Amino acid sequence: MKFSFFDRPSEDRPMLALCLLFFGVSLMSLQDSLIKLFAPHTSFWQLQLIRSSFNMLFAIGLAALAGGFHLLWPRRLWPAVARGVLLAACMLCFFGASQQITVAQMATGLYTYPLFITLLAGPVLGERIGSWRIGALVLGAAGCLLALDPFADGGSYFQLVPVLAGFFYACNVLVLRRYCRTESPLALAFVVALIFMLTGLGGAVGLEAFKAPASWQQAVPFIFVGWPPLAIGTVGVFACFSALNLIGNLFLSRAYQTADSSWLAPLDFIYLLFVAMWGRVLFESWPAPLAWLGMAMIAAAGIVTAMREQRRDPSSAPPAQAGSGRRE
């Protein structure tokens, strides 16, 4: 029997969609903050391998509930694989410096992705970039410099690493828009989980076989340690991360199926506020006033970009994929 949660809604329900969006974003931001908190006890490669294994199991279970295992295989394999590789690079850059910077700085760097979409949409998709989107690009870039401020006393170039995550996420969006618009969300999720599992396995095996210099391991252990000791409790923590990821994605996808994405997508930038809140609760850190201003400028730039995109082509993205932010 097909699970009713996957049935497409028969009518728009904006308030329900808003609640689903807020709940989904809060779970995704909590997952990201908890991964940073747990980073000293694991490695990126171990996290990717085990968490993505749980994601694959959950995806298989959802396919069984939703109508069949055929939903797990994409119609066009290689674009889906390319998207998975881009998202793996995004995750590496997003979490790679998690022990050196705050969770708010991680989120700020990632949420520059609408600016990269604006830069790449012309040469990649042949879209015309108007004055509004150019203005949003300048505003967002200025906000990024304010929020991250890597050149201040005590600043670090690690603060710029999540901006690379924003670039790779933008590339993923363009691949999704051009080649994967008709794919099943479960197929896309399954392929991403498979790519994450393979990259996690490759990184762990490679770094165990060819040890990184000790100075690198001490400076960035989350990346340059292949496979630290694994406890049963750690596996349980990874399962919780996977569950948060799955539930958050389900609520976000359902939100965009239940209301018009033209007004929901800008609200997705509340992720930055949730991340700041979790940073305060878990790490007792709070963004400085200039960082708040920079985050607001990035959010404003993203909102302008989203609104102009909807005005240009209201059907430019499938409902379940129209939102902002990292979803894997």
Which positions does each model-derived feature cover?
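Hydrophobic/aromatic residues within transmembrane alpha-helices
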Residues: F38, L47, A97, V103, ...
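Hydrophobic/small/kink-forming positions within alpha-helical transmembrane segments
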Residues: V25-L30, I60, G84, A88-L92, ...
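Helix-helix packing/entry segments at the starts of transmembrane helices
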Residues: A107-T112, Y179-I195, L246-R280
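Juxtamembrane C-cap of transmembrane helices in multi-pass membrane transport proteins
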Residues: S29-T42, L47-I50, L92-V103, G109, ...
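Glycine-/small-residue-enriched transmembrane alpha-helix faces in small-molecule transporters
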Residues: K2-Q46, D153-R178, P318-E328
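Membrane-interface interhelical linkers
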Residues: M1-S26, M56-A82, S131, L198-A239, ...
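Hydrophobic transmembrane alpha-helices of multi-pass small-molecule transport proteins
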Residues: W132-D149, L290-E309
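C-terminal transmembrane-helix exit sites in multi-pass transporters
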Residues: Y113-V138, L273-W292
